[in-house]
């Protein structure tokens, strides 16, 4: 199957500036060749609403796209100038503009492709790039820009990639529109995210939908100068800042103390920062010497052919460093301490966490706010009409999954929550476990109550244990103290009371290197005087401790032919250093225990090479345990953005297939199902004005016609609005039944039920999670290693714990 579905008009001849052949469907075709049925059948049918709307534009085309050059002005000013020209010369013919590209419904040029205009004494040069028709790639770009222009006419400003109320606005200047909230040093700017997307009609053809969501941007009124401390630079690196003079956002890569009189190369001349900001933005810098924010902005480039002979072509990136005076850089979002401030988050949560009924009104409110003033006239010129009600979708609620602990069902009250059930570990009789206790920088007596809570819970579970080795040490002696546990006490696991994240990193690094399992508890939780809260933490710690030792607190009945389930994820450092890839492979019939690997690769070739080695080791382990190779591999891949889907489909799935063919040489190949998991989506579903129930699946209407995808809500949400997870199947080879020799693909219903069942097996939470557990374990492992080693090549996982969930 081609990577893209193409529809062309045979009457159109390609020429510069003329009508050209264009793709009618711009997304790549990711649906596997073997799949014909993409809609599941199991479950109870329910009616849902979603944050999409139908809309109509009467303008038919043809359309013209120009490149526009004018003196440096804000996009709002440029748009106003072009509007004045359209009203005076073209009788108000519709157009849209994104700051550089101009789209029109009539010719703005004469016989030459380039036209020079003068509008209100401003010289403007426009150059024709192409003309196009409806349902082309440019058409959808144009409609997205139309909606961006509508928001500009509503009085919003572009911050980053979205449109919000202006960063300099105050409560008294807010016109009717998105919400504005201010408290202490924080501003919350409201806005809308609008995108034209493709859906699927009942007959399988493509439809066009308007995705719409209310969004917020959190701004901190503190600039970098006011919060800068030399010994706390690490707390600022990785955070986002906004520069209010141009409403652009940047990420802090580094901070350096500089002088505003230092010079920077600007074209063919040098200019001081002081003079640059005075001449360009009329800003007088106040502090001569101050911290400068260093932001490394990545620019995409095309790799030279000579560098891509042995790997697929794709974009690479080069770094361009920007230095910005700290007094002009205002922080966005929250610091770690602000994020953990319960009172602050509670107050701001009234704006940030919106309930389902509020979100259902977003489309109606958007229509109301755009139906006045300049935005109304602008929409009228395009003949645009938006349905004020969100679309209705058919969903299905999958059957609840039974949870068993020691062969007893424990989710009898609430299917997706079994915290009231009694957990029992199936520990063989006579097995004894030795635990050591280490207290860092504190007196061990402060944690006696917590230790007794732990002992009481282990005793309740009727597990043999000893916990006699209790030690204390300073922060710089942690490794030595843990080494004594291995050499002298010979413990199976250490319970460590940690004062901060730095000690936590030391402990987990020691675990990976030596294989000593550890359970970390913050000293705040360990010394809590509230008996109930302290006991809750102790009980949860015990559950994690024995899960790390290889015992299952609960399980599910998921009967399949010998199957291995794989989780893949990548951690990207905020500082732009090397990424960390984690892969986990199931090695138990209940899909509860995994063998884990972590790698730091320089490029895609090295990534595939490491992944091949991991697959070989995992499959060999599986064969040794079950005396057979897996007949089916289900791979859940996280960490793939929308722009990487086509690349992943074309190259990564092909690389996986070649690995498996090599490993299974002279054997029947297993069925391979490769699924991309995407959590960071803004699609919402609503049932009767509230959140949908866990187990709700949507695989119609809003899914793309050239994708094999579905949405699954697996968690119950009591505050705010539930977020589904998107699953995109890139590969689904055929399964061969050895008994009957029948060949078939996995039905959508079965894959959806397996995916939902796997969200019940995270042994750190007695309930469902948003993604299948191997995906989450890979995420936990990649994040743990990435944060500990900060871009440095991580050590290999010690063989003693490779088959343990040490990262719980």
Swiss-Prot record:
Pfam families for this protein: PAZ (PF02170), Piwi (PF02171)
UniProt xrefs under PANTHER family: EUKARYOTIC TRANSLATION INITIATION FACTOR 2C
Covalent S-S links between cysteines: none
Taxonomic lineage of the native organism: Eukaryota, Metazoa, Spiralia, Lophotrochozoa, Platyhelminthes
Name used for this protein in its record: Piwi-like protein 1
Family in the record: Belongs to the argonaute family. Piwi subfamily.
Organism: Schmidtea mediterranea (Freshwater planarian flatworm)
Domain Piwi positions: 492-790
Disordered: annotated span: 300-322
């Amino acid at each position: 199957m081609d990577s893209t579905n193409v529809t062309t008009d045979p009457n159109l001849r390609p020429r510069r500036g003329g009508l050209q052949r264009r793709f009618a469907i711009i997304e790549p075709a990711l649906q596997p060749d073997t799949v014909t049925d993409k809609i599941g059948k199991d479950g109870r049918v329910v009616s849902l609403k979603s944050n999409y709307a139908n809309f109509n534009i009467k303008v038919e085309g043809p359309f013209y796209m120009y490149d526009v050059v004018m003196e440096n002005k804000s996009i709002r000013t440029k748009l106003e100038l072009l509007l004045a020209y359209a009203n005076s010369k073209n009788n108000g013919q519709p157009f849209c503009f994104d700051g550089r590209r101009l789209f029109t419904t009539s010719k703005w040029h004469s016989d030459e492709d380039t036209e020079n205009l003068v509008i209100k004494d401003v010289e403007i040069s426009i150059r024709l790039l192409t003309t196009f028709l409806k349902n082309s790639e440019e058409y959808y770009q144009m409609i997205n820009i139309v909606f961006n222009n509508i928001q500009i006419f509503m009085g919003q400003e572009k911050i980053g990639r979205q449109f919000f109320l202006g960063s300099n606005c105050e409560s008294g200047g807010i016109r009717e529109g998105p919400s504005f909230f201010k408290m202490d040093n924080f501003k919350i700017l409201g806005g809308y995210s609008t995108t034209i997307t493709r859906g699927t009609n009942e007959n399988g053809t493509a439809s066009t939908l308007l995705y719409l969501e209310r969004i917020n941007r959190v701004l901190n009124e503190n600039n970098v100068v006011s919060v800068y401390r030399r010994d706390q630079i690490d707390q600022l690196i990785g955070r986002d800042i906004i520069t209010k003079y141009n409403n652009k956002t940047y990420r802090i890569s580094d901070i350096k103390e500089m002088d505003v009189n230092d010079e920077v190369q600007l074209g063919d001349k040098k200019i001081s920062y002081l003079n640059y900001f005075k001449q360009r933005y009329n800003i007088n810098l106040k502090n001569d010497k101050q911290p400068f924010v260093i932001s490394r902005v990545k620019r995409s480039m095309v790799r030279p052919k000579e560098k891509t002979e042995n790997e697929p072509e794709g974009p690479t990136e080069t770094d361009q460093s920007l230095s910005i005076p700290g007094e002009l850089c205002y922080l966005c979002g929250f610091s770690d301490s602000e994020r953990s401030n319960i009172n602050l988050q509670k107050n701001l949560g009234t704006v940030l966490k919106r309930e389902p009924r509020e979100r259902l009104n977003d489309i109606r409110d958007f229509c109301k706010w755009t139906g006045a003033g300049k935005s109304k006239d602008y929409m009228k010129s395009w003949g645009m009409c938006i349905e004020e009600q969100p679309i209705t979708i058919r969903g299905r609620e999958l059957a609840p999954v039974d949870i068993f602990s020691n062969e007893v069902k424990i989710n009898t009250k609430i299917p997706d929550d079994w915290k009231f059930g009694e957990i029992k570990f199936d520990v063989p009789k006579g097995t004894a476990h030795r635990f050591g206790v280490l207290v860092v920088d504190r007196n061990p007596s402060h944690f006696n109550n917590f230790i007794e809570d732990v002992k009481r819970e282990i005793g309740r579970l009727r597990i043999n244990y000893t916990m006699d080795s209790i030690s204390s040490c300073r922060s710089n002696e942690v490794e030595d103290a843990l080494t004594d546990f291995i050499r002298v006490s010979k413990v199976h696991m250490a319970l460590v009371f940690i004062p901060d994240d730095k000690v936590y990193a030391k402990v987990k690094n020691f675990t990976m290197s030596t294989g000593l399992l550890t359970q970390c508890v913050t000293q705040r939780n360990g010394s809590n005087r509230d008996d109930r809260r302290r006991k809750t933490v102790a009980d949860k710690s015990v559950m994690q401790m024995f899960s790390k030792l290889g015992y299952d607190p609960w399980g599910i009945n998921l009967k399949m032919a010998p199957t291995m389930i794989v989780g893949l994820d990548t951690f990207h450092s905020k500082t732009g250093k090397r990424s960390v890839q984690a892969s986990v492979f199931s090695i138990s019939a209940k899909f509860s225990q995994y063998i884990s690997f972590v790698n730091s690769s320089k490029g895609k070739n090295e990534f595939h090479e490491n992944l091949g080695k991991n697959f070989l080791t995992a499959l060999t382990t599986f064969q040794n345990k079950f005396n057979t190779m897996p007949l089916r591999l289900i791979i859940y891949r996280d960490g793939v953005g929308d722009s990487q889907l086509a690349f992943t489909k074309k190259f990564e799935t092909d690389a996986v297939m070649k690995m498996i063919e090599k490993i299974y040489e002279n054997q029947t190949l297993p069925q391979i199902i490769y699924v991309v998991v995407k959590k960071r989506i803004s699609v919402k579903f609503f049932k009767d004005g509230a959140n949908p129930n866990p187990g709700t699946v949507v695989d119609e209407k809003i899914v793309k016609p050239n994708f094999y995808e579905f949405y699954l809500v697996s968690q119950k949400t009591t505050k705010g609005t539930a977020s589904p997870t998107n699953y995109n199947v890139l590969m689904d080879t055929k399964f061969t039944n050895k008994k009957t020799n029948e060949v078939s693909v996995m039905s959508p219903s079965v894959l959806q039920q397996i995916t939902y069942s796997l969200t019940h097996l995270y042994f750190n939470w007695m309930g469902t999670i948003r993604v299948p557990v191997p995906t989450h374990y890979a995420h936990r492992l990649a994040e743990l290693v990435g944060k500990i080693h900060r871009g440095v090549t991580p050590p290999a996982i010690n063989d003693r714990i490779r088959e343990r969930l040490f990262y719980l």
